[in-house]
């Protein structure tokens, strides 16, 4: 089919987004061109600025346009002494929305995966080890995903903490609030039973 080369290029570019296939990309492209050209221009400008100006925090490795992000430079968070280790910057947003954590973070940008050739240095564990040795950390909270790779990564970091004399803890995981036991998979239910706690009145 004969079509505009620029339109084809736009649709192909939109397909780099997760979950966007040919049809979705086509719909987005036509919507921007037909109904919202000003929105398309804002999107293009925001993307251009973000791609050129956003880098990584020198301390925690999350996304920021500053050398050190607002969380790491916050004196109250520095005094807290807790560092929460996560796999991606998106995990920080999820935890921050709970309002339950007032410490700092360290972003791995992935997890250990020997089969894919991803080792400790590839996810910044050499830098984390330096922080364990040089900073006064009261607790390292391991909030990696509850996958095989996430658990292996958490165990590896826990060993680093033991060597550095820093307390390490793992976030709890199990039956979701509002969930029904019969709908929960066996592995999750096993974790819930193993991580049970006493009810004190």
UniProtKB/Swiss-Prot annotation:
Specify the Toprim domain's residue ranges: 81-176
Single Gene Ontology BP annotation: double-strand break repair
Q: In this record, what's one Pfam family? A: RecR_ZnF
Start-end of C4-type zinc fingers: 57-72
Q: Does the keyword DNA repair apply?
A: yes
Give the keywords, sorted: DNA damage, DNA recombination, DNA repair, Metal-binding, Zinc, Zinc-finger
Q: Which InterPro entries match?
A: DNA_Rcmb_RecR, Rcmb_RecR, Rcmb_RecR_Znf, TOPRIM_dom, TOPRIM_RecR
Q: Which GO terms describe its molecular function?
A: DNA binding; zinc ion binding
**Protein function:** May play a role in DNA repair. It seems to be involved in an RecBC-independent recombinational process of DNA repair. It may act with RecF and RecO.
Q: Belongs to which family?
A: Belongs to the RecR family.
Which PANTHER family does the entry mention? RECOMBINATION PROTEIN RECR
The protein here is known as Recombination protein RecR
Origin species, per record, is Salmonella typhimurium (strain LT2 / SGSC1412 / ATCC 700720)
Q: Gene name, please?
A: recR
């Amino acid at each position: 089919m004969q079509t505009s080369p620029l339109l084809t290029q736009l649709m192909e570019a939109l397909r780099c987004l997760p979950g966007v296939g040919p049809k979705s990309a086509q719909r987005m492209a036509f919507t921007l061109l037909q109904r919202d050209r000003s929105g398309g221009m804002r999107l293009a400008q925001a993307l251009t600025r973000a791609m050129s100006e956003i880098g990584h925090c020198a301390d925690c490795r999350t996304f920021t346009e500053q050398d050190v992000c607002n969380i790491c430079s916050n004196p109250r968070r520095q005094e807290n002494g807790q560092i929460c280790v996560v796999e991606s910057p998106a995990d920080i947003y999820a935890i921050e929305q709970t309002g339950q954590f007032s410490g700092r973070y360290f972003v791995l940008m992935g997890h250990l995966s020997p089969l894919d050739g991803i080792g400790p240095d590839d996810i910044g564990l050499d830098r984390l080890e330096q922080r364990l040795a040089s900073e006064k950390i009261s607790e390292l909270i391991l909030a990696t995903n509850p996958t095989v790779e996430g658990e292996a990564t958490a165990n590896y970091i826990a060993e680093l903490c033991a060597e550095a004399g820093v307390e390490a803890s793992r976030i709890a995981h199990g039956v979701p609030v509002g969930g029904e036991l019969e709908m929960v998979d066996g592995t999750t239910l096993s974790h819930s039973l193993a991580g049970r706690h006493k009810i004190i009145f």
